[in-house]
Amino acid sequence: MTETLETPATKIVPRLKTKYAESIKATLQDEFKYENVNQVPRLVKVVVNMGVGDAAKDSKLIDGAVRDLTQITGQKPQVTKARKSIAQFKLREGMPIGAHATLRGDRMWEFVDRLVSLALPRIRDFRGLSGKQFDGNGNYTFGLTEQVMFHEIDQDKIDRVRGMDITVVTTAKTDDEGRALLKALGFPFKTEA
């Protein structure tokens, strides 16, 4: 019989995660004078949310949002249901009104890398992200008006243009620390004039 040499499968570390560990972490530690390496801000999770308000009238619309989010994030999103009924919006409790996916670990790093290097530069007339959308604790939320900027989405197969909200949660204590981290990761912020 022949012996097969079993080599352990090498795990590919995301490019942005490697860059963070090798250069960004040390730069931030020097900039903010942290005494402990664990005080350096890092990414915790990225939440991608797609609200589909018209799904109250047509329940098939939620399927398109789920399909688009699955292609963009690489994982199946959670369907968001209405918490309470609102008669003016013809909304019943439990109706699907959106979808969201929470990315952590390597999927999060890959998504942020694709977002910064591929998706954001494809936006027409893009001038940069606003630096005023931090929440006071170093977390950043911004909205995108359409999903076609992601190269995973086939423009011929989309049923309608949908926007999305993306929240980047960090361990930063202040907005300045969060901004420095995201800028180092490649987020294109507008230069405030």
UniProtKB/Swiss-Prot annotation:
It comes from the Bacteria. GO terms for biological process: translation. Pfam families: Ribosomal_L5, Ribosomal_L5_C. GO terms for cellular component: ribonucleoprotein complex; ribosome. InterPro entries: Ribosomal_uL5, Ribosomal_uL5_bac-type, Ribosomal_uL5_C, Ribosomal_uL5_dom_sf, Ribosomal_uL5_N. Keywords: Ribonucleoprotein, Ribosomal protein, RNA-binding, rRNA-binding, tRNA-binding. One of its GO terms (molecular function) is tRNA binding. The keyword Hydrolase does not apply. Belongs to the universal ribosomal protein uL5 family. This is one of the proteins that bind and probably mediate the attachment of the 5S RNA into the large ribosomal subunit, where it forms part of the central protuberance. In the 70S ribosome it contacts protein S13 of the 30S subunit (bridge B1b), connecting the 2 subunits; this bridge is implicated in subunit movement. Contacts the P site tRNA; the 5S rRNA and some of its associated proteins might help stabilize positioning of ribosome-bound tRNAs. Part of the 50S ribosomal subunit; part of the 5S rRNA/L5/L18/L25 subcomplex. Contacts the 5S rRNA and the P site tRNA. Forms a bridge to the 30S subunit in the 70S ribosome. This is Large ribosomal subunit protein uL5. It comes from Pseudarthrobacter chlorophenolicus (strain ATCC 700700 / DSM 12829 / CIP 107037 / JCM 12360 / KCTC 9906 / NCIMB 13794 / A6).
